[in-house]
Amino acid sequence: NYTSLIHGNAYPPIAEAISAAAVTGTVFPSMHLSQLRLAEEIIARVPAVDMVRLTNSGSEAAALALRIARRATGRRALVTVSGGYHGAVPPFTEGEPETRTLPFGDSAALSDMLDDHVAAVFMEPFLGAGGVIPQDPGYLRAAQEAAHRVGALFVVDEVQSLRNSPHGEAARLSLDPDLVLMAKIIGGGLPIGAVGGRRELLELTAATRPEHLEHAGTFNGHVATAAAGLVSLQHLTTAAISELNAHAQHLAEHIEAAGADRGFPLVVTRSGSILNVHPGDAPVTSPADAHRFPPERAALHLALLLEGIYTTPRGMINLSTALSEDDLSAVYRGYDRACERLAS
């Protein structure tokens, strides 16, 4: 589910919220109470967010954030990090003329890459699609300072990472972004995205402003999605997050031990309740490291499928509050048997 189903499939309170919302209607031409309640929950939860604009996906949220940054700064260029992911849409795809890509973790490159042509710097607390590799907090803070030094906005992509801390990873890492991207868990398993941040930036999209930044979408803030997202966030308590993260830590330790004991070494990278399993025994500290041993990675994926364990082909695992001790034990056994199969 690529981090979206924090409470698992068909979580009863979310299913009930969707059903109750659908009875009232699905698409309205103006604001709906469920949208307001979801926005209020996000604002209360994420310190950097004064206002929220809803979209239909994380990719749409990233595109809107860039449009806001360009309007606010009068600039065009954006900066991302090698191995980062902010949606498979231009200009966030490789080869775009206005996109500059920083080498992962290279603080020295910040001063070389950032200048008065840059509208925004986009960063993830960890590289989600790049192998679940946490970025160094000092590097993230340096990027924020460098962006502000040249008058650019600092945008933190919390599409995946929001689930890992009660107030989001940006707050946990003492970051103060201008804009925050959100999706996945804030929709309770339905399509959603959101841009939150400083009031003066979000107000650029207000239709009451002359020459406002146009942002429209028939299904933005869909009634059922907003209702599902509200329940998803309300049920993701501090205690639930702590328990999930502890399960993930134990699972990571078990997987590495299973591989070492059975002769098929594995390295696990992790951020909160999101893990990525990599073949080999060398540390995985960069996106390049995460792409080693493609045949072994494919073989592990298949071996796990044969044991009834589904991960992404690149080895990502997302835990949910729906997992029982029996479920986790089954995952442990699945990795044990998969490693035995591959080592033989």
What annotation goes with each model-predicted range?
Residues 1-344:
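Conserved N-terminal phosphate-binding loop of PLP-dependent enzymes in the Aspartate aminotransferase
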